[in-house]
Amino acid sequence: MLKSFKTEIHPTEEQKVRIHKTIGTCRFIYNFYLAHNKELYQNGEKFMSSSKFRVWLNHEYLPQYPEYLWIKEAYSKAVTQAVNHGQTAFKKFFNHESAFPKFKKKGRSDVKMYFVKNNPKDCRCERHRVNIPSLGWVRIKEKGYIPTTKEGYTIKSGHVSMKAGRYYVSALIEIPDNKTADPSNEGIGIDLGLKDFAIVSNGKTYKNINKSARLKKLEKRLVREQRCLSRKYENLKKGESTQRANIQKQKLKVQKLHHKIDNIRTDYINKTIAEIVKTKPSYITIEDLNVSGMMKNKHLSRAVASQKFYEFRIKLKAKSRENGIELRVADRWYPSSKICHCCGTIKKDLKLSDRTFRCHCGYVEDRDFNAALNLRGVKTYKIA
């Protein structure tokens, strides 16, 4: 089984320069690939795949335009992966899975430096450092987090990323299967919401962390820092004395706050999933939420985005697979909140403001807990 381990690293100044150059080259190549295919389409020519583009780039374009030979200075596997990402983006567009690919803007896009194990000396890992192709040995902040080479583990591939002035490495490692599910245990249903983050059919409720005092304080601070950054840009447009270095410092402050808030939410999701999986249910049933549709509601979009429902589903799927637990996804149109768990009657006139489910049979329960109970016993589902 392949598992990804992500942790912060402490590269030297020389290594930071290489990371910046490689990530910048990957961003340039990705945008170049999109622009070239867009030009081919406008000229009525055939779409160019990633492999054909690399051949054309190395044998036709670069010899003709030697001023772009700096592209070859970057780690070749990272550049190749950037082109592959561009091809994947086009395939998703052609299959009507996403919108037309957008260009990646400097400083605003999540571009990563990909690496892969090519020879035995590459991608070695020790307790306090990891060997990355084109960078060499890099210090790890959390010592012992990534399984080491001495323990018999091998890094297959990975990537280096930057966020808010910090550097991270994500390593893909093959580990033995560790299935802990007990078939004798009962399955559970999980209802996700905005009032509370997750309501489990076993009676456990996980609160909405965005309502905590800590996050509210950070969000207020973020608003102040964003307002300060906006004023600096306004002063620059008016021609007043505002140095660009101060703008960059303020941008970094805003990025760090965004990163801190995001880390708190992600950490809460990880701990919630770990606690759910520790109960060792035979299966877990969740609902197929239409998150993109929910985001179209201007009154709820911010609250929906801050809950990170999609990330919860992806991580729950990975954790369930790791522990041998079957993850079931109920049909998108299954009315889990409107069905009486006691008699099965569908209450069609149930409003979003009705927080308590009351049925004519006398059954009274919290609507979210009632939905979790219904999800636990749903018969129509698909395996995630």
Segment roles from a protein language model:
Residues K6-E8, H85, R129, Y168-S170, ...:
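Beta-strand secondary-structure signal
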Residues Y33, A78, A82-F93, R367-K379, ...:
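Stable alpha-helical structural segments in soluble proteins, enriched in small hydrophobic residues
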Residues M1-V79:
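Gly/serine-rich nucleotide phosphate-binding loop at the start of the catalytic core
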Residues K52-R166:
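Acidic carboxylate diad motif detector
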Residues L34-Y41, F90, F94-P101, I175:
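Long, hydrophobic, amphipathic alpha-helical segments used as structural scaffolds
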Residues E13, V17-H20, K77-T80, V200, ...:
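Ordered, soluble secondary-structure elements with a strong preference for glycine-centered loop motifs
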Residues K3, T148-E151, K163-A384:
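Positively charged, helix-rich recognition surfaces that bind polyanionic ligands
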